[in-house]
């Protein structure tokens, strides 16, 4: 497996001319906790699906979501990253999948559309835990309705030991198309509660040993792996982590109905480091004649 820290630098250099440009002028709002079994406004447009085609069939592979990291060099702006479970980018033999597409909402039509995803070799892994099942890439799809999750809304982004309480309400999102005659994008919300807040070692199919918490949500479909999991934390919802639908515990009756959650600190470590590298790269490029400029 490639070294993550090298991947960060390589990704920043390779993508800077395309995604300098993945900077938002305004950071998204923090999600507020509403009544039970409701999804706070502003969170449903952070999710996207990962699919591939087999003949005329569309195969659901996994789920991804967007995160916004404030730029330290350019106050008031944020870098936008697409995040998913790393194993979604690999086939059953551990090799990079080909032909992966991102499904998300078109801002003009409101319908689901498909955009090609960069190959696995362009994605960045956690610089501290290269085997953690997380991968990210700078990406701001043109003409798409997205609302990235602010870095400050990731549980444990400031305190790595922060964790939710047992029984706290959670929900996770997956992308879907609804409607027969008039198709439109919808983020499907599934609800549950925190079952095991303290992470424990668990084997994830396709990703090896991972440190996961658990939610009780009646079982999760395989394509939901990579989905953002939100937990009620006081007066707001925070990102608890990445859903892991396929673990070695799925066949254990003791853990029936539970799904794993990779803690959000792995996401925070990855995207924060990417933001630092992109900040430095953009600052250097701005000093070079003809280099990419940061939008005013």
What are these regions (language model features)?
Residues 84-88, 174-176, 191, 239-249:
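Short beta->alpha transition motifs characteristic of CBS
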């Amino acid at each position: 497996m490639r070294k993550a820290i090298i991947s960060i630098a390589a990704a920043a250099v390779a993508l800077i001319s395309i995604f300098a440009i993945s900077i938002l002028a305004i950071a998204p709002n923090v999600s507020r906790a509403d009544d039970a079994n409701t999804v706070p406004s502003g969170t449903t447009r952070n999710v996207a699906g990962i699919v591939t085609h087999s003949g005329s069939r569309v195969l659901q592979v996994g789920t991804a979501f967007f995160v916004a990291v404030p730029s330290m060099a350019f106050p008031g702006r944020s870098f936008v990253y697409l995040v998913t479970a790393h194993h979604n980018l690999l086939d059953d033999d551990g090799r990079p999948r080909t032909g992966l597409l991102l499904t998300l909402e078109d801002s003009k039509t409101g319908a689901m559309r498909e955009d090609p995803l960069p190959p696995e070799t362009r994605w960045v892994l956690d610089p501290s835990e290269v085997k953690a099942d997380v991968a990210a890439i700078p990406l701001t799809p043109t003409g798409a309705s997205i609302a990235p999750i602010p870095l400050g809304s990731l549980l444990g982004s400031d305190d790595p030991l922060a964790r939710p309480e047992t029984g706290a309400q959670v929900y996770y999102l997956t992308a879907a198309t609804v409607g027969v005659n008039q198709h439109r994008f919808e983020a499907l919300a599934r609800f549950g509660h925190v079952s095991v807040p303290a992470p424990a070692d668990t084997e994830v199919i396709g990703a090896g040993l991972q440190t996961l918490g658990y939610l009780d949500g009646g079982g999760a479909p395989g394509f939901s792996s990579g989905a953002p999991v939100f937990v009620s934390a006081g007066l707001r919802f925070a990102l608890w982590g990445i859903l892991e639908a396929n673990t070695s515990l799925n066949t254990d009756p003791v853990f029936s109905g539970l799904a794993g959650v990779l803690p959000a600190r792995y996401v925070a470590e990855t995207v924060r480091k990417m933001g630092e590298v992109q900040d430095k790269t953009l600052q250097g490029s701005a000093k070079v004649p003809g280099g990419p400029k940061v939008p005013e």
